[in-house]
Swiss-Prot record:
Family per similarity comment: Belongs to the cytochrome P450 family.
Entry EC no(s): 1.14.-.-
Name of the featured protein: Cytochrome P450 71B8
Gene3D superfamilies recorded: Cytochrome P450
Major subcellular location class: membrane
Gene source species: Arabidopsis thaliana
Coiled-coil regions listed: none
Enzyme kind, highest EC tier: oxidoreductase
Binding site for heme: 443
Example of a GO MF term: oxidoreductase activity, acting on paired donors, with incorporation or reduction of molecular oxygen
């Protein structure tokens, strides 16, 4: 594909070369980076997995590396020191987002909080979502939903345990995670909906995520040229098609909420925002509209469902590959919680310390997103002695930082004990572990995300032993990665659950 693009752009070489020269004056001390080609910059040096390509390049060129995507300078951060400088010391100057085509389309011209540019509207929307979805009172109120979904997960797995059949853990975890997030946020149980089922919902989430983070030439090349290439290549059509499907789904959700007259207590986000729309409520500097609602629903679908599902799968993959860790964790869980526990509750989450270490280690090796969402520099700044020009994009590689030997001993080894007796956590104060980001653009759904993750894993590890299919050994587990925003395990993890003789499910 790159070769065909080069042919399309070749006749514009003199013009674009001039643009490059004007974009980054030579008097500045810019970050090092690989030499790019005219017109396309470094695009030809990127493989299928962007995080892996960036990591390899950073090992050669350093933790603050400059690439060029077309005419856009892209700074890649691969060390905790540089990440701290961006996210703490220079947070205000770097906390905006680039206006990328697919992001803007899916969020109704950036009326959300994940992709919106920094400003008053973004601040007010973040406050609103904090009050209506992620405040401690709401989190406590929705506890019953999370525990009910945990019960459903166990009951479903127990059927496979009785017949000793393989379980595709992606489907099991997706149903659990989506069940919680959609009931909490949208007020609807999609197992009972007539307009979609879980399999179609999973396909919709995957397609939406792939397209909202897909490469659009319009984002990195002069407007007319990028626009033309996106249409010739079919990229524009693919993005529009995925957007249309997701919008249609959201409209079904909204119609269902309107049909039942909305929740009287407006406990879920959709009901609460519909009430504000109907009352023409002014929130801060703007009025809440249906576009704000659709944009926030997009954030929830893209930011919540896949990330939790994928992290649970990687955790179970690493536990299966490391029997010592699995045995230690299982013994701690069952010894701490005792035999014949009828159900796992959220009080139990604070009792299993080793599980928290295991999750931290999974975050280190398999962060939910290998990069934090891209930032755009709002004014010229300096990072680690290098000049970063205004409007440059910054990508912070949590993947590379998690494998940095300057931060971690034997970084490729899965070893939860490395977090024992340390204060390192994932709440944004420790820049070697950033699954939820840090600073102004940190993830507002962190508490909900962690609760879902811990609850799902605790349920399946308390009630079941897990084994590979007959004839398969831990050396046969495929660790190949795939994905865009989140990096999933490409080959499904299929295991057999067994209910221990000492436990029973009522």
């Amino acid at each position: 594909m790159i070769k065909s693009i080069l042919l399309c752009f070749f006749f514009l070489f003199p013009l674009l070369l001039t643009l490059f020269k004007k974009l980054l004056p030579s008097k500045w001390k810019l970050p090092p980076g690989p030499t790019g080609l005219p017109i396309i910059g470094n695009l030809h040096q990127l493989g299928r997995l962007l995080h892996s390509s960036f990591h390899k390049l950073s090992l050669e060129h350093g933790p603050v590396m400059l690439l060029r995507f077309g005419v856009v300078p892209m700074v890649v951060i691969s060390s905790k020191e540089a990440a701290k400088q961006v996210l703490k010391s220079r947070d205000l100057e770097t906390c905006s987002r680039p206006k990328l085509v697919a992001n803007g389309l899916f969020t109704r011209n950036f009326k959300d909080i994940a992709f919106a540019q920094y400003g008053e509207d973004w601040r007010e929307m973040k406050k609103l979502v904090g009050l209506e979805l992620f405040n401690p009172k709401k989190h406590k109120f929705f506890r019953y939903i999370r525990e009910e979904e945990g019960d459903l997960l166990v009951k479903k797995l127990s059927k496979s345990s009785q017949t000793q059949t393989l379980v595709d853990l992606r489907k099991a975890f997706f149903s659990f995670t989506a069940g919680i997030i959609f009931r909490v946020s949208f007020g609807q149980n999609f197992r009972e909906c007539d307009f979609i089922d879980m399999d179609r919902l999973e396909e919709l989430v995957q397609e939406s995520e792939t397209n909202v983070f897909s490469f659009a030439f319009t984002d990195f090349f002069p407007t007319g040229l990028g626009w033309l290439v996106d249409r010739i290549s079919g990229q524009h059509s693919r993005i529009e098609k995925a957007f249309s499907k997701l919008t249609k789904f959201f409209q079904h959700v909204i119609d269902e909420e309107l049909k039942i007259g909305q929740s009287q207590d407006h406990s879920n986000l959709v009901s609460s925002m519909l009430d504000m729309i109907n009352r023409s409520t002014e929130y801060g500097s703007f009025k809440i509209t249906s576009d704000h609602l659709i944009a926030m629903m997009t954030d929830i679908v893209l930011g919540g469902v896949n990330a939790g599902t994928i992290t649970m799968i990687w955790t179970m993959t690493e536990l299966t590959r490391h029997p010592r860790v699995m045995k230690k964790l299982r013994e701690e869980i069952r010894a701490t919680l005792g035999p014949n526990k009828e159900r796992i509750t959220e009080e139990d989450l604070e009792k299993v310390e080793y599980l928290k270490l295991v999750i931290k280690e999974t975050f280190r090796l398999h962060p939910p997103g290998p990069f934090l969402l891209p930032r755009q520099v709002m004014s010229d700044i300096e990072i680690q002695g290098y000049h970063i020009p205004k409007n440059a994009h910054i990508k912070i590689s949590t993947y590379a930082i998690g494998r940095d030997p300057k931060c971690w001993t034997n970084p490729e080894e899965f070893n939860p004990e490395r977090f024992a007796n340390t204060s390192i956590n994932y709440k944004g104060q420790h820049y070697e572990l950033l699954p939820f980001g840090a600073g102004r653009r940190s993830c507002p759904g962190m508490t909900l995300g962690i609760t879902i993750l811990e609850l799902g894993l605790l349920n399946i590890l308390y009630y079941f032993d897990w084994s590979l299919p007959n004839g398969m050994t831990i050396k046969d587990i495929d660790m190949e990665e795939d994905g865009a925003l989140t990096i999933a395990k490409k080959v499904p993890l299929e295991l057999i659950p067994t209910l221990p003789a000492s436990l029973c499910i009522k």
